[in-house]
């Protein structure tokens, strides 16, 4: 059944993801998280087709002024992309060395709208009655980077349910230099687990190291209504 709804899948690897069974692939591309220009961020919802650009560039946009003059790759604007599990580079990467670090994506034609459901627990939430599962993941909330700019995901969007958790799920690319790197000023924010009591007043401060982090990250499931 093809009705024209769009579903976006991000592989978080350098391989194009497959569309769910019965869905046609409309195009594939690279997983764009957000742009930064004039020190202001413009976010992309990872659940919408605009987050899957068919072609990759460290600087996929230019800017124009009121004097009818436009400039490309001439200042410190940036682009941010979902990344892969490739080993962290010691230095910024350029040219073809960038490719292994950029997540691939596919835009699929779906028969119904897909939603994300979050458990706020380490258990996988159930889809509503009459809905089926498309994938399970971790509840991705928001992100910040250079200049405290960033963005976030609507928690009903499939883009808020990433199949793979990592503390640094995206990479920064500098348009003028044509390089990409994981810088120390990038932060990711995730829904956390909440005790079974549905109302929590004062949380207890905690610091989580590798190996324990996933025990405090909310799980999610992307669901689609059965037709």
From Swiss-Prot:
The keyword ATP-binding does not apply. Coiled coil: none annotated. Keywords: Basement membrane, Collagen, Disulfide bond, Extracellular matrix, Hydroxylation, Repeat, Secreted. It comes from the Eukaryota. It is found in: Secreted, Extracellular space, Extracellular matrix, Basement membrane. One of its GO terms (cellular component) is basement membrane. Prolines at the third position of the tripeptide repeating unit (G-X-Y) are hydroxylated in some or all of the chains. Type IV collagens contain numerous cysteine residues which are involved in inter- and intramolecular disulfide bonding. 12 of these, located in the NC1 domain, are conserved in all known type IV collagens. The keyword RNA-binding does not apply. Its main location: secreted. SUPFAM superfamilies: C-type lectin-like. One of its GO terms (molecular function) is extracellular matrix structural constituent. Residues 4-227 form the Collagen IV NC1 domain. Disulfide bonds join 19-108, 52-105, 64-70, 127-223, 161-220, 173-180. InterPro entries: Collagen_IV_NC, Collagen_IV_NC_sf, CTDL_fold, NDNF. Alpha chains of type IV collagen have a non-collagenous domain (NC1) at their C-terminus, frequent interruptions of the G-X-Y repeats in the long central triple-helical domain (which may cause flexibility in the triple helix), and a short N-terminal triple-helical 7S domain. Belongs to the type IV collagen family. Type IV collagen is the major structural component of glomerular basement membranes (GBM), forming a 'chicken-wire' meshwork together with laminins, proteoglycans and entactin/nidogen. Potently inhibits angiogenesis and tumor growth. PANTHER family: COLLAGEN TYPE IV ALPHA 4 CHAIN, NEURON-DERIVED NEUROTROPHIC FACTOR. There are six type IV collagen isoforms, alpha 1(IV)-alpha 6(IV), each of which can form a triple helix structure with 2 other chains to generate type IV collagen network. Interacts with EFEMP2. This is Collagen alpha-2(IV) chain.
